[in-house]
Amino acid sequence: MRAVLLGAPGSGKGTQGERLSQQYGIPQVSTGDLLRAAVAAGSELGKQAKAAMDAGELVSDQIVIGIIRERLTQPDAAKGYILDGFPRNFTQAQALDEMLATLERPLQAIILLDVNFEVLMRRLTGRRTCQACGAIYNIYFSPPEVDHRCDKCNSDQLVQRSDDNEETISNRLRVYEAQTAPLVDYYEAQGKLYKVDGEDDITKIAKNIGQILETAR
């Protein structure tokens, strides 16, 4: 199975990607993780990516596509893969399709996790992390049993990330929406886009995605 998980920040892409990876025995390919690994390994593409990041620039699509290509030609991706976090826009989608065509391994399904803007805001602004043990909560959906106190270690150091404020998150979501609209149209035209209600519980979402992937095989 060769698939892409699309969704806004807070839509649950990472969680569903992990479940699909385990279920199908195929790698979850996150561009963020790939870039960090390439930089750490000191590969040629990793060096180019590091140079861009050190200069405060975005890593070019050409470099990212090259790193993805290297990853998808590894043995564990022979049966398929789940792309998480890429493509982010129309240009990247076209470049990805062109690269996959050279490998003769086109995408089979693009899963869009559809979540209401207000729900995304609550998911992201409500996140709290225990500084003592790393446990993660959400004050709206999965709060600690006692306000401001960690269930696991009893610490009162539950903090909100500095970039989890409403203004920053709202801007991130607006940018995502603007970039993703043409991407959705692009994959719909190919007949490969499937929308899944990302507000259901995690198990039901996973079941719905699994049914789609079985059909798309």
Curated annotation (Swiss-Prot):
Subcellular location, principal: cytoplasm
GO cellular component entries: cytoplasm
Family of the protein in this entry: Belongs to the adenylate kinase family.
LID, as annotated region: 126-164
Residue numbers binding Zn(2+): 130, 133, 150, 153
NCBIfam families, A to Z: adk, PRK00279.1-2, PRK00279.1-3, PRK14527.1
UniProt binding sites for AMP: 31, 36, 57-59, 85-88, 92, 161, 172
Signal peptide span: none
Amino-acid positions noted as binding ATP in the UniProt annotation, renumbered to this chain: 10-15, 127, 136-137, 200
GO BP annotation list: AMP salvage
Subunit (UniProt): Monomer.
Record InterPro entries: Adenyl_kin_sub, Adenylat/UMP-CMP_kin, Adenylat_kinase_CS, Adenylate_kinase_lid-dom, P-loop_NTPase
Region (NMP): 30-59
EC number: 2.7.4.3
Keywords recorded for this protein, A-Z: ATP-binding, Cytoplasm, Kinase, Metal-binding, Nucleotide biosynthesis, Nucleotide-binding, Transferase, Zinc
Catalysed reactions, semicolon-separated: AMP + ATP = 2 ADP
Function: Catalyzes the reversible transfer of the terminal phosphate group between ATP and AMP. Plays an important role in cellular energy homeostasis and in adenine nucleotide metabolism.
The protein's name: Adenylate kinase
Compartmental location: Cytoplasm
Source organism (scientific name): Nitrosococcus oceani (strain ATCC 19707 / BCRC 17464 / JCM 30415 / NCIMB 11848 / C-107)
